[in-house]
């Protein structure tokens, strides 16, 4: 399993499609930030389909991968959308 943090800046006409798509795999944190755990096959499928949704000449999607055993998250201020539980 991979733990991902995805941050994106995409054109206004694609932002809702990207947001809705990422919600099928990951937990929305705030604005254009998603995080969560995916399997290797989910990761491959997600990258392929995400690439089809964006325009690589205009849009930017940054994907950070973390081994789960090294994951530590610190939040300063209010947490916009807390994760109640992780399966």
Feature roles, as predicted:
Residues 1-5, 10-87:
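Basic nucleic-acid-binding interfaces
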């Amino acid at each position: 399993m991979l733990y991902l943090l995805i941050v994106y800046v995409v054109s206004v006409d694609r932002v809702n499609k990207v947001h809705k798509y990422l919600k099928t795999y990951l937990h929305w944190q705030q604005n254009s930030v998603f995080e969560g755990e995916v399997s290797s096959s989910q990761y491959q499928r997600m990258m392929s389909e995400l690439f089809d949704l964006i325009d690589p000449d205009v849009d930017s999607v940054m994907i950070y991968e973390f081994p789960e055993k090294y994951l530590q998250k610190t939040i300063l201020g209010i947490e916009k959308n807390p994760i109640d539980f992780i399966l």
